Amino acid sequence: MKNKNQMKVEKILRLPSWIKFPISKASEFEKMQRLIRKSNIHTICEEGRCPNRAECYASGTATFLLGGSICSRACAFCQVNKGKPSEINKYESIQVAEAVKILNLKYVVLTSVARDDLPDHGANLFVSTINQIRKIDPKIQIEVLTPDLWGGGKSFEDKDKLQKDRLKKILEQRPICFNHNLETVERLQKEVRRGANYKNSIGLLEKAKSIAPNIQTKSGIMLGLGETLKEIETTILDLKKVDCNQITIGQYLRPSLKHLSVKKYWAPKEFEYLKSFCSKLGFKKVSCGPLVRSSYHAG
C-alpha cells in the first residue's frame, strides 16, 4: 500500500487571465432563476452550471432540459446529476411552453438528459414539447440538442435502426437546427463520454442530414482534455464529411474535483486558428472561444 509521500499528486492548472466570466445584473439573474424554480422546469444552464448563464439570463434566454435532472449516463466531464432517472413529469412539455410564453422567446433550445431507461430514449419528450411550444406560436424557432439516441435491440443493426427511427420522430417536427455534440476527439471518447461512441454520434449527424437535408446540423467539441491539434482538425474534418453545417468549440472547465482534470487551457490565438480552419472548410456558422458552449448565442 502506498503511503502519502508515494501517492501521485494531481497537478491542477491555474485559470488563465484570458478566461473571464461575464457579469450581469443580479436582478435579471435572480428573476430567471425564480421563474425556473416556480415553473418546476430544468435548464442545462443551471444543471450544467454553465459559465454564461448570467449573460444569457440577462438577455432572457435559456436552454430547457427535458426528462428531469438526473441522467442515466455518467460522462466524466458533466455537472448534471447521474443515477436512476426520475419518473417522467407528464406536464413538463406544457410547463416549458408556458415558460417560453412568459419569457416571450422567439428562439428556443431544447435538450435532455440521456434516458436509456425509456424505450424511445426520450425522443417523444422533444416531440411533445415542440408541439406545445408551437401551440403558443408556430413562428417560434426551435433548436434541438439530443443525446445519441443509441441503445435497445440485440444486434448493431437493431440499434442502428432504432436510432434512426427515434431521430426521424424528432426531425418530423421540423426544428430549425439539429444539434448533437461529439464533445471530444475519438481517442478520448471512452474516458470522457461513458456510454457513448464516436462513430455512433457521427452516424447520428449523418442520418439527420439524410432524413432532413434542409435542416441545419450542428455539433460541438471541448478542448483541454488531452487532445492534440491534429486530433481536433481530424474531428472537424469528420464533421464536415457528414455535411455538418455549424460547429462550436470551447474550453473545458472542470466542474469539481470529482470530474476530469483540465490538461491544458487553449490560448485565444489557438481558438482563432481553429475558427479560421473551420471557416475555410465552409461551415456556415462557427463559434469558437474559451467560453463558447453549444447553445451560447444560438439562433
UniProtKB/Swiss-Prot annotation:
Pathway: Protein modification; protein lipoylation via endogenous pathway; protein N(6)-(lipoyl)lysine from octanoyl-[acyl-carrier-protein]: step 2/2. It is an enzyme of class 2 (transferase). [4Fe-4S] cluster 1 binds at residues 45, 50, 56, 295. Keywords: 4Fe-4S, Cytoplasm, Iron, Iron-sulfur, Metal-binding, S-adenosyl-L-methionine, Transferase. GO terms for cellular component: cytoplasm. Residues 57-284 form the Radical SAM core domain. Its EC number is 2.8.1.8. [4Fe-4S] cluster 2 binds at residues 71, 75, 78. It comes from the Bacteria. Its main location: cytoplasm. It is found in: Cytoplasm. Transmembrane segments: none annotated. Binds 2 [4Fe-4S] clusters per subunit. One cluster is coordinated with 3 cysteines and an exchangeable S-adenosyl-L-methionine. It catalyses: [[Fe-S] cluster scaffold protein carrying a second [4Fe-4S](2+) cluster] + N(6)-octanoyl-L-lysyl-[protein] + 2 oxidized [2Fe-2S]-[ferredoxin] + 2 S-adenosyl-L-methionine + 4 H(+) = [[Fe-S] cluster scaffold protein] + N(6)-[(R)-dihydrolipoyl]-L-lysyl-[protein] + 4 Fe(3+) + 2 hydrogen sulfide + 2 5'-deoxyadenosine + 2 L-methionine + 2 reduced [2Fe-2S]-[ferredoxin]. Its cofactor is [4Fe-4S] cluster. One of its GO terms (molecular function) is 4 iron, 4 sulfur cluster binding. Belongs to the radical SAM superfamily. Lipoyl synthase family. This is Lipoyl synthase 2. It comes from Prochlorococcus marinus subsp. pastoris (strain CCMP1986 / NIES-2087 / MED4). The gene is lipA2.
